[in-house]
């Protein structure tokens, strides 16, 4: 059985996180500069010590220091001595760095189909009507065996469906040119921001996070998010997609002695800001269900009020750093934060929140029965790793000596919707340049668009026989090579994604 993790201390009290309760989720809150990052780092390296892999997003660029041993100083030793810590020893931790843009870590990619229309609609800032059209686009792609892997696939099928909207209207409903235009503008905007890097293959294999090193320590996976953070919706969507991948791919585990992985979601308010209710409902569902897969999710934000109540109620472990109350709204937030913790008769929780110093926190971890412990005021013990970023040379060393180096660096562009539609256009052009011989019957729905539709999606003969088009032929060929192209994953019903 894993030993409890010592996270914080007072001169006469030790506060432990029970490994078996780490997957009951958690919350780290506090104003800027009060010590949230240090707490996050301490929790991450403590979990790593007992063989639990960790994922966390590095928004400020200062978490990578967890890969290097800390530096001993007189000030640090004096602070540790004041709270009764006498056995502190600096050490490094196993770290793999990731980056959606592929600049400061291994590239992270998802296919368009896997992200799904629900998250993509939020990325594109679509309204309900436009989101409905995006769902139709995904449905047509699914029905016709068109793989949506990268941005050019989505652009190509959006343009094709927009140009042929009337052909699909009877089966799928109205596809307005205005909605198609909004989707195309959204795609252009995302592409100009560099978001296209996120879409494609090889897609992230979530099992690459579930590693331990030769000494049995859990690997700490750090997503470089300084640039990504400037695109809040992509930041939130990409991390939520990662959570959904964990849920979809991991088997049911029940209650374990320690989690399979702990996922820290920094700047968590970005996940919920302006999110439609349907997405909020799905987020709540994912958080509730993922616990049974042995995954703990910890949100990091400034205030507990950043988290919707139905999600907040699922976060059993709490670390509350200082909050400032300069306005009536701030005072209300402090009071609400105090009410989320189990009161300690020894002090006024609401008052204490405003008095906490840097690195000091009000802490309530779950006990062995899963009940919140009485809140205690304590100092978070300094991490044994470096508090600050790695150098460029150190980062390059982490990348080049990573166990996944070479797996994600080169993008793969296999045959998908874009290539299928391009072949259809080429075949249609050839048909236009070589019209039927004189006297032969010409299809009623002639012209380049009608001809293209027949070439792409096939024709029906006078006796009802179906002749496959380019799409069907290529899809059948691809299906023989790839057994799981368009199969919906379990989370497809949750987030609208489709397995490749």
Curated annotation (Swiss-Prot):
Top-rank taxon of the source lineage equals Bacteria
Q: Pfam families recorded for this chain?
A: HerA_C
Family of the protein in this entry: To E.coli YjiB.
Name used for this protein in its record:
Uncharacterized protein YjgR
- The record lists the organism as Escherichia coli (strain K12)
| Encoding gene (name) | yjgR
